Amino acid sequence: MSNAYLTYAAKRLGQAIVVILLAYIFTFVVVSILPGDPITSVLRNPQNGFTEQEIAEIIAAQGLDQPVIVQLWHSLSSFLTGDLGMSMRSNRPVSTLIAEVLPSTLVLAASGLTVALILAFTVAYGTQVVPKKYGQGLLRAFPSLFLSTPNFVIGLFLIHLFGFQLRLFRVIEPDSFWATFFAAITIGIPFSAQIAEVLIANLDHEAEQDYAAVARSRGIGPKRLFATHLLKPASLPVVTVIALTVGELLGNSLITETVFGRTGIGSLVQRSVSTQDLPVLQEIVSLGAVVFVVVNLIADLLYPLLDPRVKIIIGAKRRESIADDASLPLGTGAKP
């Protein structure tokens, strides 16, 4: 692994850390200025059953009687050490509340991503091997059609068709296999349209290159050409698409959980908003920002390893820098 790549990785890591810190501070400020007093609406709500002594202990433990800047410092310090604080509503650790529902959301998001990849690559494959007179135009219209379709519309349609009309699953059992399956499809279809749009465009571009024309002149058919020549170079941008849309994927998962009535991070967010449980809401949003930044960081670090053209660019920049420092033209002894 070259020094240029290590420098690049260290720079991207530093940028990611700064973005995470700024995202946490921004989230804290936004949550702090939300209308309403959580002490009155949550702690002093008779339905929650807190005594005055318990209220005083919670206020002192969470530092709610401290200035905002002090609260921010303590909150950020605790977050960086893995302490997500306590829920004002249940007086339980926020990390415990998230851990109870996170697996369900992760399973749904992973299932949706799997559906999206399978569907996107299938559609892209069809655009390269299916003759135009046999429906290739419909396959090429797939991204445009579903990019503009909200996922909750797809979810409601699937619930109506397969839940009420065909009765394939019971709507009151949102965690059943079929409910999870259709929830994954709800997430996967719009996401697959984004991937397919990029993949089809790159496949068309690669198909026009000289190496593809040479392969066709040697008698290689569309299926083999797709598998052995076009797929790999055209698939590299998909890594970037997935990284850039991971936030949308998680957001769609939360919306889909609400539509299908599933227990997950979405239901926890909904409950936290309705009860003004600000510590829970703040940590969920902050963790979402961390996931988004980390996934994009991984994509940035992987891309130079997956695409030789990116490595050449990194190396070329380093060679130019060394040549400039030595006042020598490239190729006269400057070592990369």
Kindly label every feature range from the protein language model.
Residues N3-L6, I98-G135, N151, D175-P336:
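Alpha-helical transmembrane segments of integral membrane proteins
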Residues L139-A193:
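Generic hydrophobic transmembrane alpha-helix motif, especially the helices
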Residues I55-T96:
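Short membrane-interfacial helix/loop motifs at transmembrane-helix boundaries
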Residues M1-I33, T228:
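Charged, compositionally biased N-terminal leader segments and the immediate start
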Residues L34, F146-T149, L250:
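Transmembrane helix irregularities
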Residues G14-V18, V68, A110:
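Membrane-interface helix starts
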Residues V19, A23, T27-V31, G155, ...:
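Juxtamembrane/transmembrane-helix interface segments of polytopic membrane transporters
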Residues I20-V70, R167-F182:
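Hydrophobic alpha-helical transmembrane segments of membrane transport/permease proteins
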